[in-house]
């Protein structure tokens, strides 16, 4: 509840930042908002823009979206007549840019949550990481929200809470740890009432996948990937139109339905929801095409002999897809992955590192930093941007191989419950599923081991266009696994008439035409032995 939140006064420099903004608004100066290139960045800037337009409808605001995945402000792109630059969700470490702006007589406010070594002397930095603010797991949009709370206080209005839906979605998308009670409170409050027309259009577009449920999981898996795909893979025009949709533009975009000749005008929120779905599909096709090329390089160079996959993708992969592809490779090869590309300007390799969450290394960022061979590793524990010199690449590869020589990379499942056959029931599965709104952001959906089930192999259905889905029913519970490997299916079908099987999976509910059935989505399974009965 709200008692778990912290007063905005605990954020250093926040009152100075508010006074600075109000000065420029009262003087009708031009304000420049730098939008950061991810969901949290877009939601942060949308919240700030919409709030300012509520308190000063005629304010002069211009905004800029980076052409790639750059973070922070690019000074050269700021028009000469700008008096104030605001950087939500980025910019704390742009000391050089802050100094240039100050020398030009331009004020700069940073509303950020990323770690930084020191506080800038030439900008007003509001960042929960550089002060005594207790909640370090609050994303950029959360800091912007606190900033707007101070504006509420100063102007005697109550507008900030209108944007809690953006606070919720930004924190979910930025993978904040929702075990922080303040962050969890704001997320749950924001999800209770989605106001933003664009997010509503996205939810409508994804209603089949979400089954109409709005919770942490549905935003994380069905909404955030669409926004991030457009940021990562959309054209500049598509990204700009997406931000317009975020801030409630009433524009329309031309749209011609497939098979029809007449072009219609579609409201920008609906149009961008449709376009985001299409961009993500295009992104995934490009990802899969590049994956094949990279996997061929892995085979040619025998890179699987290494404990951590380190691959130069300079001539292969678009930089915007680096993290996405690294994640796919880590899942497939069950080990951490580092994808590198040479940066001529900086004369070193940069790229993305991704850990394997079922492996033995639980924090790949810290693991890389501990080697002392990387220039930097910035980001989340299992997903970070890295830099390394050419000379250190081969050396660090040898270090990792020696350090991990006794490690076998295989799936390790830390289950919450082990249910023997006597405890397996439909009521248990339905009971676990009732807590679905809690899972996410560091509170993982329980992983259950169902052990000792005796299954007749003829009762295991092989489904799907590729015949790679298995399904069987045990005690009124449907057990389903998608994307099975051929050897997994053979292990079931060619192992006798009756098998004993252990399953690791998560509890779900399937609703169809009013009928509710208990389901277990299988993560993995093991056929222990063939059962033979003599009678």
Tell where the protein language model's regions lie, with residue ranges:
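Hydrophobic helix-and-loop "lid/oligomerization" segment in the mid-to-C-terminal part
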Residues: 1-84, 103-104, 152-398, 412, ...
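Conserved phosphate-handling catalytic cores of large alpha/beta enzymes
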Residues: 77-78, 85-102, 106-168, 176
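A residue-level signal for conserved active-site and pocket-lining positions in enzyme catalytic cores
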Residues: 86, 228, 432-433, 505
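OB-fold/S1-family single-stranded nucleic acid-binding modules
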Residues: 513-534
């Amino acid at each position: 509840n709200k008692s778990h939140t912290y007063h905005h006064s605990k954020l250093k420099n926040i009152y100075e930042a508010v006074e600075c903004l109000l000065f420029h608004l009262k003087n009708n100066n031009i304000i420049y908002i730098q939008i950061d290139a991810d969901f949290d960045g877009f939601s942060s800037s949308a919240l700030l823009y919409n709030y300012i337009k509520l308190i000063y409808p005629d304010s002069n605001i211009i905004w800029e979206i980076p052409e790639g995945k750059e973070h922070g402000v690019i000074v050269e792109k700021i028009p000469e007549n700008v008096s104030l630059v605001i950087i939500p969700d980025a910019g704390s470490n742009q000391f050089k840019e802050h100094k240039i702006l100050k020398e030009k007589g331009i004020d700069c406010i940073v509303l950020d949550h990323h770690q930084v070594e020191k506080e800038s002397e030439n900008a007003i930095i509001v960042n929960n990481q550089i002060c005594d603010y207790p909640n370090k797991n609050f994303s950029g949009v959360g800091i912007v929200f606190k900033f707007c709370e101070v504006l509420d206080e100063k102007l005697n209005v109550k507008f900030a809470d209108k944007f809690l839906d953006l606070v919720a979605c930004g924190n979910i998308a930025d993978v904040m740890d929702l075990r922080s009670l303040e962050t969890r409170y704001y997320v749950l409050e924001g999800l209770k009432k989605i106001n933003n027309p664009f997010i509503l259009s996205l939810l409508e577009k994804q209603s089949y996948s979400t089954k109409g449920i709005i919770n942490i999981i549905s935003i994380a898996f069905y909404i955030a990937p669409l926004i991030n795909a457009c940021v990562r893979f959309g054209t500049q025009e598509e990204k700009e139109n997406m931000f317009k949709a975020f801030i409630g533009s009433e524009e329309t975009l031309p749209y011609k339905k497939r098979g029809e000749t007449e072009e219609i005008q579609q409201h920008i929120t609906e149009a961008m929801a449709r376009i985001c779905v299409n961009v993500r599909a295009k992104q995934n096709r490009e990802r899969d095409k590049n994956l094949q090329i990279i996997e061929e390089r892995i085979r040619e160079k025998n890179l699987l002999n290494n404990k951590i996959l380190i691959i130069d993708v300079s001539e292969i992969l678009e930089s915007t897809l680096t993290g996405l592809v690294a994640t796919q490779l880590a899942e497939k090869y069950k080990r951490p992955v580092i994808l590198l590309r040479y940066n001529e300007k900086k004369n070193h390799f940069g790229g993305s590192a991704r850990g394997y969450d079922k492996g033995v290394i639980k924090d790949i960022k810290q693991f890389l930093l501990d080697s002392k061979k990387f220039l930097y590793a910035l980001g989340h524990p299992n997903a970070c941007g890295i830099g390394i010199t050419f000379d250190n690449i081969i050396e660090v590869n040898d270090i990792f191989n020696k350090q991990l020589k006794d490690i076998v990379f295989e799936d390790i499942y830390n289950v919450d419950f082990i249910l023997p056959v006597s405890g397996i029931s439909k009521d248990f599965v339905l009971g676990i599923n009732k807590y679905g709104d809690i899972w996410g952001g560091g509170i993982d959906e329980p992983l259950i081991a169902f052990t000792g089930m005796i299954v007749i192999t003829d009762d295991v259905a092989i489904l799907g266009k590729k015949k790679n889905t298995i399904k069987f029913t045990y005690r009124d519970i449907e057990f389903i696994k998608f994307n099975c490997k051929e050897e997994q299916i053979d292990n079931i079908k060619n192992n006798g008439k009756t098998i004993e099987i252990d399953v690791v999976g998560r509890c779900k509910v399937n609703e169809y035409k009013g009928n509710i059935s208990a389901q277990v989505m299988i993560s993995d399974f093991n056929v222990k032995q063939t059962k033979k009965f003599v009678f």
